[in-house]
């Protein structure tokens, strides 16, 4: 595991770059970025440049902030809890979150927090839970805009046919996370 740092300026938005090389069933999860503002985590994302640029710009604009290097208690706690999660010793997180997005996106992300560890829901099922069964595409779009992956478990949303679809970290990473949370684990 390699930890590399990054942070914020006009407000105090800290970004911390983390490399988790997790070997699970011969697969890897790659560099992730963590960021916080006002002692709340606002970013835990995959280092996929095109996706990250969009999310970074949205967060910077809404929070009127820019990045600079550093670390905080929130980042340290998040790293510890993610390490426990990847080791199979944590099923929930108690990190304070700052959800940065539209009201609709925040509604979707808050509902994602209700999906239990080891369980999945379809986009159609999620849209029904939110009381808007015709909003499947809008809900999928909000799910894809989630800036706090893993802690806000967008990876637990799957297609109605139970197939893995759409994930900011890529489908191989989504499969690794779902396998990690599966009750059928071999270790």
Predicted features, each with a name:
Residues 145-149:
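Terminal helix-turn-helix DNA-binding modules in bacterial transcription factors
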Residues 4-133, 184-187:
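Basic nucleic-acid-binding alpha-helical/helix-turn surface characteristic of O6-alkylguanine DNA
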Residues 160-187:
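…primarily DNA-binding HTH/wHTH and HhH modules…
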Residues 150-157:
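Short Lys/Arg-enriched helix C-cap and helix-to-coil transition segments
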Residues 139-144:
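Major-groove recognition helix of helix-turn-helix-like DNA-binding domains
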Residues 107-111, 138, 176:
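Pre-recognition alpha-helix immediately N-terminal to the DNA-recognition helix
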């Amino acid at each position: 595991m390699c930890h590399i740092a990054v942070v914020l300026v006009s407000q105090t938005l800290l970004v911390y770059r983390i490399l988790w090389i997790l070997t699970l069933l011969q697969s890897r999860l790659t560099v992730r970025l963590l960021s916080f503002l006002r002692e709340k985590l606002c970013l835990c994302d995959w280092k996929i440049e095109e996706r990250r640029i969009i999310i970074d710009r949205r967060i910077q604009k809404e929070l009127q902030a820019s990045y600079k290097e550093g670390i905080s208690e929130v980042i340290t706690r998040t790293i510890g809890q993610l390490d426990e999660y990847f080791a199979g010793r944590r099923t929930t997180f108690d990190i304070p979150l700052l959800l940065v997005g539209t009201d609709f996106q925040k509604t979707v992300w808050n509902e994602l927090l209700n999906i239990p560890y080891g369980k999945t829901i379809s986009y159609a099922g999620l849209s029904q839970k939110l009381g808007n069964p015709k909003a499947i595409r809008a809900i999928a779009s909000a799910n894809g805009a989630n800036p706090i992956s893993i802690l806000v478990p967008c990876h637990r949303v799957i297609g109605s046919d139970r197939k893995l679809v759409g994930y900011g970290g890529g489908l191989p990473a989504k499969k690794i996370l779902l396998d990690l949370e599966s009750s059928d684990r071999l270790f």
